[in-house]
From Swiss-Prot:
Residues 34-190 are periplasmic. Residues 532-541 have a biased composition (Polar residues). Pfam families: HAMP (PF00672), MCPsignal (PF00015), TarH (PF02203). Belongs to the methyl-accepting chemotaxis (MCP) protein family. Signal peptide: none annotated. GO terms for biological process: chemotaxis; signal transduction. This is Methyl-accepting chemotaxis protein II. The keyword Cell inner membrane applies. The gene is tar. It comes from Salmonella typhimurium (strain LT2 / SGSC1412 / ATCC 700720).
């Protein structure tokens, strides 16, 4: 359960619980202090009220004593020889009575407690009677009325006031004792509350300690131990920490780091093995490369000789192509001229055909006129026959006109037939001339294409000539590079030896890590096969690069 709670949430809950306990304890302490304050206020008020009543009672007793002494002296000194002493006693009685009234006024100004209301009212009633009696006694003594003085029942009033004050004192004592008992009870209750809070606090601390230890300390200790094992090179153990809090996330991150480190170490081991085997293959390849470099040098010499012969042949082909291009251009000009002549003939034939068509149209008009004339002559003959002898001459003329119209129509038909035959022949000639023009156009186009092809052949021959010159330069450059390759082979052998030593050191460094049993033996041959496959494909890639270089040349 604790593993599912985040550390921040747990700390906030603990702080919330402690804050709640602090509020509860503070509230209880405030309540206890409030009760104590109320008890203290009650005790203080009782003390002040009791003090004022006591002072009032004492002063009233002194007033009674002074009055009694003054009355006694007045009775013993009938001649009034000690009038000053009597006056002083009487004045003291007035003063003490006034002081008693002042103290009682202070008592009355204090608000009585509810429990003391009845006793306070009783005291007030008895006080008012006794105070009035004392004032009346003072007045009797001032007037010298001794009979009235002794006849007044002052002692009964004094006793009644004393009993009322005693009752008030007993009620006050009971209230004070109740207040004290309540304070003692509050104190014991506060002690019990503090004890309960202490027990609850201890229980909460135990729960918090158990939760922190279970959710934070123990998983953190396992994570630290696991990290130390990883630091010592042991990658075989796994970290088992469950939960969705920060410690669980930390454990998951450490576990992911361990897996990544295992993959890295495995790849480094495989890479070091591949590098070690690759350095051996590089050393063997350097030996083969040295012999192949010598063979390449001799082949380059033969290639240089062949390139010289090829250069001479290509230059001769370029010259022949230039001459053929010039002849083709001349034939193209002649064909263009013939095409223009044929175009002129075609245009002339079209004009003749148009003229023949116009003549045929005119003959058609003449034929129509002859036909209309024949009809008119026929109508004239009919009218002449109707006229009789008067129209005989007109009939002869009409007959001649008909004969002329018939011969004109016949001649027009023959001319029309000849013209139509001429038009058909002109059309046939036009078709033949157009065919000849198209043929001349095809000849011109063919000669033009031949001219273009010969020009391209000539330019290609020039390009080949320049390319062969560049190839010759490249062959000489390749010869120089081949000489450099011989020295590079020696440097490569030294580098392969150094690489083999570094691979051995890398293998020793990686061997410090201990890995769990994994099917690595199966992966290594696959790695070797992939390396061999890549090495087998290398000549093809080199050949492809060589072809690209040849195309560049």
């Amino acid at each position: 359960m604790f593993n599912r709670i985040r550390v921040v949430t747990m700390l906030m809950m603990v702080l919330g619980v402690f804050a709640l306990l602090q509020l509860v304890s503070g509230g209880l302490l405030f309540s206890s202090l409030q009760h104590n304050q109320q008890g203290f206020v009650i005790s203080n008020e009782l003390r002040q009220q009791q003090s004022e009543l006591t002072s009032t009672w004492d002063l009233m007793l002194q007033t009674r004593i002074n009055l009694s002494r003054s009355a006694a002296r007045m009775m013993m000194d009938a001649s009034n020889q000690q009038s000053s002493a009597k006056t002083d006693l009487l004045q003291n009685a007035k003063t003490t009575l006034a002081q008693a009234a002042a103290h009682y006024a202070n008592f009355k100004n204090m608000t009585p407690l509810p429990a003391m209301a009845e006793a306070s009212a009783n005291v007030d009633e008895k006080y008012q009677r006794y105070q009035a009696a004392l004032a009346e006694l003072i007045q009797f003594l001032d007037n010298g009325n001794m009979d009235a003085y002794f006849a007044q029942p002052t002692q009964g009033m004094q006793n009644a006031l004393g009993e009322a004050l005693g009752n008030y004192a007993r009620v006050s004592e009971n209230l004070y004792r109740q207040t004290f008992d309540q304070s003692a009870h509050d104190y014991r209750f506060a002690q019990w509350q503090l004890g309960v809070l202490a027990v609850v606090l201890v229980l909460i601390l135990m729960v918090v300690w158990f939760g922190i230890r279970h959710a934070l300390l123990n998983p953190l200790a396992r994570v630290i131990t696991h990290i130390r094992e990883i630091a010592s090179g042991d990658l075989t153990k796994t970290l088992t920490v469950s939960g969705r809090n920060e410690i669980g996330e930390l454990a998951g991150t450490v576990e992911h780091m361990q897996r990544s480190l295992i993959d890295t170490v495995t790849q480094v081991r495989e890479g070091s093995d591949a590098i070690y085997s690759g350095t051996s293959e590089i050393a063997a390849g350097n030996t083969d490369l040295s012999s192949r470099t010598e063979q390449q040098a001799s082949a380059l010499e033969e290639t240089a000789a062949s390139m010289e012969q090829l250069t001479a042949t290509v230059k001769q082909n370029a010259d022949n192509a230039r001459q053929a291009s010039q002849l083709a251009q001349s034939a193209s000009e002649t064909a263009r001229h013939g095409g223009k002549v044929v175009d002129g003939v075609v245009n002339t034939m079209h004009e003749i055909a148009d003229s023949s068509k116009k003549i045929a149209d005119i003959i058609s008009v003449i034929d129509g006129i002859a036909f209309q004339t024949n009809i008119l002559a026929l109508n004239a003959a009919v009218e002449a026959a109707r006229a009789g002898e008067q129209g005989r001459g007109f009939a002869v003329v009409a007959g001649e006109v008909r004969n002329l119209a018939s011969r004109s129509a016949q001649a027009a038909k023959e001319i029309k037939a000849l013209i139509e035959d001429s038009v058909s022949r002109v059309d046939t000639g036009s078709v033949l001339v157009e065919s000849a023009g198209e043929t001349m156009t095809d000849i011109v186009n063919a000669v033009t294409r031949v001219t273009d092809i010969m020009g391209e052949i000539a330019s290609a021959s020039d390009e080949q000539s320049r390319g062969i010159d560049q190839v010759a330069l490249a062959v000489s450059e390749m010869d120089r590079v081949t000489q450099q390759n011989a020295s590079l082979v020696q440097e490569s052998a030294a580098a392969a030896a150094a690489l083999e030593e570094q691979a051995s050191r890398l293998t020793q460094a990686v061997s410090a890590f201990r890995l769990a049993s994994r099917p690595l033996a199966v992966n290594k041959p696959e790695m070797r096969l992939s390396v061999n496959a890549q090495s087998g494909n290398t000549p093809q890639s080199l050949a492809a690069r060589d072809d690209a270089n040849w195309e560049t040349f």
